[in-house]
């Protein structure tokens, strides 16, 4: 019974993170960038090492013309990414934002 409770609790925690990320994605697609950042913050609290969260956060900051915040998010994306394509994308953005 104890294992079942732990399993259900962990499922709820991860579902919350995915739900917030889904809401952020929907808000981003609708052009509601500030609202999307709010959902990203919720998602980030439950999964601080997910590079996809930092990628989305960086893109939102770029859309809001907040290059310093975008640069920091891309640096975290690169730090936590194990995917070559995502790492490459982060490096391109970091280089571009560093030149501004």
Identify the meaning behind each predicted range:
Residues 17-28, 55:
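Alpha-helical tetratricopeptide repeat
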């Amino acid at each position: 019974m104890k294992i079942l409770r732990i399993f259900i609790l962990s499922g709820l925690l991860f579902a919350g993170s995915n739900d917030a990320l889904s809401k952020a994605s929907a808000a981003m697609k609708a052009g509601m960038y500030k609202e999307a950042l709010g959902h990203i913050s919720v998602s980030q609290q439950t999964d601080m090492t997910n590079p996809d969260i930092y990628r989305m956060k960086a893109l939102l900051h770029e859309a809001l013309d907040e290059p310093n915040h975008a640069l920091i998010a891309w640096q975290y994306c690169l730090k936590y990414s194990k995917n070559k394509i995502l790492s490459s994308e982060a490096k391109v953005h970091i280089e571009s934002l560093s030149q501004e």
